[in-house]
């Protein structure tokens, strides 16, 4: 019984190989590009490989269907599989390392300011204040007395001469101006600073009137004229002054006092004229 089954299986296998080789040769002869010898050789190798693959697939199917628990019957190369997996994983690892570099923490700390928690609230730490030397403070104070605002060239020149940055000079002038305004409102500025700064209206001298003359007029030759005792000044104002709105009778004495001082000058001139 077994001999009959073996003979039938071999006949079926031979018929399958023959039919496959015949179909391959027939199709290959129809192609105009390949010669006959090449077609025959290729059909032989393809037919043998096809038969081997078919037998292997049938054996795997049979072992899987009748013996599902025996996985050892399936032939595969675990070494090749492991090497392929390792090589692909290694390639992925190198790509990840080159494409995504890890950021450095010190750079973040340098760019971001330090933050401290004060009463449960974040607060940025201020930079330390600039400590000016006595020479720098004296030079800045002298320049502030001359002018309270500096142009860009002046600020750059002053900063270079004192060894400071322009920002430090700018901040010093801003703080000094605010302090000066606060003292000026409270009336605590000394007299020398008022005259030097020139901001207060009282520091500027009052404008001199056009008709005011010095108390001791001088002649052309440089000799002073001796004053003569005169009576009380005339408080009566001329008639043309009453036409102006700015004139008041209380100011008549102050405006007419210089005119009384001119009288000795004219009288002395007249007396000298009579001598000659």
Swiss-Prot record:
Residue intervals annotated as DNA-binding region are 125-184
Compositional bias annotation for Polar residues? 218-238
For molecular function, the Gene Ontology terms on record are: DNA-binding transcription factor activity, RNA polymerase II-specific; RNA polymerase II cis-regulatory region sequence-specific DNA binding
- What GO biological process terms are annotated to this protein in UniProt? cell differentiation; embryonic morphogenesis; embryonic skeletal system development; regulation of transcription by RNA polymerase II; tissue development
Which InterPro entries has this protein been placed in? Distal-less_Homeobox_TF (IPR050460), Distal-less_N (IPR022135), HD (IPR001356), HD_metazoa (IPR020479), Homeobox_CS (IPR017970), Homeodomain-like_sf (IPR009057), HTH_motif (IPR000047)
- Family matches, as SMART domains: HOX (SM00389)
Q: Main location per UniProt?
A: nucleus
Provide the residue span(s) of the region labelled Disordered.
97-123, 191-238
| Subcellular localization, as worded in the UniProt entry | Nucleus
GO cellular component term of the entry, any:
nucleus
Keywords linked to the UniProt accession:
Developmental protein, DNA-binding, Homeobox, Nucleus
Q: Specify whether Translocase is a keyword of the entry.
A: no
The domain of life for this entry's organism is: Eukaryota
**Per the record, a Pfam family?**
Homeodomain
Task: Kindly give the PANTHER family that the UniProt entry links to this protein.
Answer: HOMEOBOX PROTEIN, HOMEOBOX PROTEIN DLX2B
Which family is it part of?
Belongs to the distal-less homeobox family.
The protein here is known as: Homeobox protein Dlx2b
């Amino acid at each position: 019984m077994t001999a009959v089954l073996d003979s039938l299986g071999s006949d079926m296998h031979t018929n399958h190989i023959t039919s496959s080789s015949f179909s391959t040769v027939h199709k290959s002869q129809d192609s105009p590009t390949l010669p006959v010898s090449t077609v025959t050789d290729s059909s032989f190798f393809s037919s043998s490989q096809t038969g081997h693959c078919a037998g292997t697939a049938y054996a795997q199917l049979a072992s899987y269907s009748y013996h599902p628990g025996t996985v050892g019957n399936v032939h595969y190369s675990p070494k090749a599989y492991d090497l392929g997996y390792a090589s692909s994983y290694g390639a992925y690892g190198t790509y990840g390392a080159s494409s995504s570099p890890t950021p450095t923490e010190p750079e973040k700390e340098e760019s971001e300011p330090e933050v401290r928690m004060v009463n449960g609230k974040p607060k940025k730490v201020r930079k330390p204040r600039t400590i000016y030397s006595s020479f720098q403070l004296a030079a800045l104070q002298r320049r502030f007395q001359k002018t309270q605002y500096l142009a860009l060239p002046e600020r750059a020149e002053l900063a270079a001469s004192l060894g400071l940055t322009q920002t430090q000079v700018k901040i010093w002038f801003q703080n000094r101006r605010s302090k000066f305004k606060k003292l000026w409102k409270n009336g605590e500025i000394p007299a020398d600073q008022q005259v030097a700064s020139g901001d207060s209206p009282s520091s500027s001298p009052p404008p001199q009137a056009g008709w005011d003359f010095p108390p001791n007029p001088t002649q052309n030759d440089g000799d002073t004229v001796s004053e003569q005792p005169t009576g009380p000044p005339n408080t009566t104002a001329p008639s043309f002054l009453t036409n102006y709105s700015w004139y008041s009778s209380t100011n008549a004495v102050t405006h007419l006092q210089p005119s009384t001082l001119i009288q000795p000058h004219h009288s002395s001139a007249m007396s000298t004229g009579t001598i000659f």
